[in-house]
């Protein structure tokens, strides 16, 4: 089962949290579509800023957005000009008060989405797929990962038939729920069509927080 299911979704509620933190009964569909518009807009606007995750929280007419990026300076801009411009654009997009929080990713080589995007960018620039994958694996392991698995699928090197190539190093325990595994899937747009790049990074074990016993540990 662990080999098939999305590793992030499998661990939600155990060691991972939701990327959207809000609840709505009647407006659920409209809020969900608004979330999708926000994420799509941020990803297109900050395509070169190495954005990994966008977390959205809602409270009444206020939307709190946390942008996890490896290049916070590019997102914030000189004197905060760029982030203020982005906030105003999201205000107009949603019709609500938007607050933006920038979270810096200290080790981008341990982030599955950023590693996958790096491989995809090299594939689009006609770098040999084996070289791109092996270099990414070496950088990730040097950054302190316990294991990594990378998979590229499609018309590799312009071959007539599509195929799947995988490389891995270290251990990636997909069945262990306390294992902190970061997963991503990105696309590379080449002259021969699209290539799918999947990345699994094992960053060590995380023990779930124990709930305090209301009876004083008895």
UniProtKB/Swiss-Prot annotation:
Function: Binds the lower part of the 30S subunit head. Binds mRNA in the 70S ribosome, positioning it for translation.
Pfam families given in the database record: KH_2, Ribosomal_S3_C
Gene giving rise to this polypeptide: rpsC
Residue stretches making up the KH type-2 domain: 38-106
Family: Belongs to the universal ribosomal protein uS3 family.
One GO biological process term: translation
Keywords, ordered alphabetically: Ribonucleoprotein, Ribosomal protein, RNA-binding, rRNA-binding
Provenance organism: Ligilactobacillus salivarius (strain UCC118) (Lactobacillus salivarius)
Top-level taxon of origin: Bacteria
UniProt cross-references to NCBIfam families, sorted A to Z: rpsC_bact
Gene Ontology molecular function terms on file: mRNA binding; rRNA binding; structural constituent of ribosome
GO cellular component, one term: cytosolic small ribosomal subunit
CDD domains: KH-II_30S_S3 (cd02412)
PROSITE patterns assigned to the protein according to its UniProt record, in alphabetical order: KH_TYPE_2, RIBOSOMAL_S3
Protein name: Small ribosomal subunit protein uS3
Statement: the UniProt record of this protein carries the keyword rRNA-binding: yes
InterPro entries on file: KH_dom, KH_dom-like_a/b, KH_dom_type_2, KH_sf_prok-type, Ribosomal_S3_C_sf, Ribosomal_uS3_bac-typ, Ribosomal_uS3_C, Ribosomal_uS3_CS
Assembly and interaction partners: Part of the 30S ribosomal subunit. Forms a tight complex with proteins S10 and S14.
């Amino acid at each position: 089962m662990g080999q098939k299911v999305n590793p992030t979704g499998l661990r939600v509620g155990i060691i991972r949290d939701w990327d959207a933190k809000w609840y709505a009964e009647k407006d659920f569909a409209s809020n969900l579509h608004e979330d999708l518009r926000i994420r799509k807009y941020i990803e297109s606007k900050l395509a070169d800023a190495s954005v990994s995750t966008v977390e959205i929280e809602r409270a009444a007419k206020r939307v709190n957005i946390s942008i996890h990026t490896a290049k916070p300076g590019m997102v914030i801009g000189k004197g905060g000009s760029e982030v203020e411009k982005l906030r105003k654009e999201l205000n107009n997009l949603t019709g609500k008060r938007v607050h933006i929080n920038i979270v810096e990713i200290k080790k981008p080589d341990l982030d599955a989405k950023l590693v996958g995007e790096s491989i995809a960018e090299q594939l689009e620039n006609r770098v040999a797929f084996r070289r791109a994958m092996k270099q990414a694996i070496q950088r990730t392991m040097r950054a302190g990962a316990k294991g990594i698995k990378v998979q590229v699928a499609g018309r590799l090197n312009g071959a007539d038939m599509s195929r799947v190539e995988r490389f891995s190093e270290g251990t990636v325990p997909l069945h262990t729920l306390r294992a902190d595994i970061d997963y991503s899937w990105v696309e590379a747009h080449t002259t021969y069509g699209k290539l799918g790049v999947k990345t699994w990074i094992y960053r060590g074990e995380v023990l779930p927080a124990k709930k305090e016993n209301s009876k004083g540990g008895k």
